[in-house]
Amino acid sequence: MGLRYSKEVRDRHGDKDPEGRIPITQTMPQTLYGRYNCKSCWFANKGLIKCSNHYICLRCLTSMLNRTDYCEICGEVLPKRLTFETTPTAPPYTP
């Protein structure tokens, strides 16, 4: 299911990355000062999206996009196009 879209994007854009896509990370590495957390709710530490100088989770991003196109924390434009850094995996399909 996910491979079809990836192949279409690859055929359309070649090997270069599509422009305007923000990477979504499944797991963030530990830093010197601890874990990365969502700057809005402070609970989520997986599936974070980088805004201008901080990270926000998908739930907070969706709720902010329902209200306005700008981030309530930093005032920058919120990311709308996402791409996965690692391709999600699924069990093999057997009809």
From Swiss-Prot:
Motif PTAP/PSAP motif boundaries: 88-91
Subunit structure: Interacts with protein NP; this interaction probably directs the encapsidated genome to budding sites. Interacts (via RING domain) with polymerase L; this interaction inhibits viral transcription and replication, Z partially blocks the product exit tunnel for the releasing nascent RNA product. Interacts with the glycoprotein complex; this interaction plays a role in virion budding. Interacts with host eIF4E; this interaction results in eIF4E reduced affinity for its substrate, the 5'-m7 G cap structure.
GO molecular function per UniProt: RNA binding; zinc ion binding
A GO cellular component annotation in the UniProt record: virion component
Membrane topology, record value: Lipid-anchor
UniProt comment concerning the protein's domains: Late-budding domains (L domains) are short sequence motifs essential for viral particle budding. They recruit proteins of the host ESCRT machinery (Endosomal Sorting Complex Required for Transport) or ESCRT-associated proteins.
Lipid group attachment sites (N-myristoyl glycine): 2
Family under the similarity heading: Belongs to the arenaviridae Z protein family.
Subcellular localization, as worded in the UniProt entry: Virion; Host cytoplasm, Host perinuclear region; Host cell membrane
Name of this protein: RING finger protein Z
Protein's organism: Tamiami mammarenavirus (isolate Rat/United States/W 10777/1964) (TAMV)
